[in-house]
C-alpha cells in the first residue's frame, strides 16, 4: 500500500512482493521435477520473455500478476517472481528471505559482500525469536528409525548409516531423564556426515522410490543440523529432551542470534527497524 501511495505521488520504481513458494505453486502437489510439473518443463526457455514482458507493463508486481503471467507463458510463478526481483528497486518479503540460512535469496546475498541494500525491517520485535528458530536445529530419534525402514530395501548402505545415528541417539536417550545438556556431540555429527554422504550417492542413482518424501525431509533436516553445528559457539546450547508424544529429540538451540543477524545485515548499507510494540 505504501508503494502504491508513492506511485500515486509520482514515484517511479519497480516493486516486487515475494510470496512463499507453496502459495505460488499452481500444481496440486509441489514437485519441481520437470517430469512431473508442466511449468518446470522448459521453464528456462520461456522465462526471459515472461520477465521482459512484465517489466514493460507493470511497476508493482503482486502474486496475482505473477500467477497470470506464469499461466500465459507456462513458467514457474515463484521462479518468475525471483527473476523479476533481480530487476526491482524494492522487494517486499518475509524475514526468511534475508535472514534464514536455508532460504535466503542467494542471487542477492550469496557472494557475502556488502551491497547498496537498505533493509527496512517491520515488526522488529519478532525478529529475535524468529532468528532463534532459524539458527536452531532439531532432530528426532524416531525419524531415523522410520526412514531406515523405508530406505532399507533400496540402499543397505544408507540404512546402515541411519542405524548408526539411531544408536548414538539411543545412548543419549538412556542418559536423559527429562532433558539433558550435552557438552560434546562430535560423534553424532560425524555419523550425520556419513549418512549425508551416503544419501548424496543414493539420491544421484535413485530418482524415485516409495518414501522419497520422508527421506528427503530427514535429509534436509540433517543438512540444516550440520550447518548449524558448524556455527556452534558460546551463543548455543545443545540439549536432548523427551517430547510430549514420548519421542526423543536433540536440539542445537541458538540462545543469542545477534552475530548471525549482524552477518546478514552487514550485506547491506543500512538498516531501519520498525516496531509499534518496542
What function would you assign to each model-found segment?
Residues 66-86, 91, 102-109, 198-278:
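A contiguous, basic/glycine-rich beta-loop/short-helix subdomain that forms a polymer-engagement track
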Residues 2-6, 127, 261:
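Hydrophobic packing residues within well-ordered alpha-helices of enzyme cores
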Residues 1-91, 99, 149, 160, ...:
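A substrate-engagement module of RecA-like helicase motors
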Residues 61-64, 140, 185-189, 255, ...:
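General structural signal for secondary-structure boundaries
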Residues 11-14, 114-117, 268-269:
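Short glycine-/polar-rich loops that comprise or flank the Walker A/P-loop
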Residues 71-196, 273-278:
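Signature of the SF2 helicase/ATPase Hel1-core->accessory helical subdomain module
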Residues 26, 128, 230-233:
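Short amphipathic alpha-helical interaction/hinge segments
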